[in-house]
């Protein structure tokens, strides 16, 4: 299950993206962890190109 605020790491570039908003049923708006590098992607595409990073728990 994907939700706003989830972090994903691109498998090819190593960049970390955060889900900022969801548009429609399948489109996600991602923003780079440092505030740069925005992109739109589908949920299916995100699962193929990125891996979800688990939240840090103390």
Residue ranges: model-predicted function:
Residues 32-58:
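Intrinsically disordered, low-complexity, charged/polar segments
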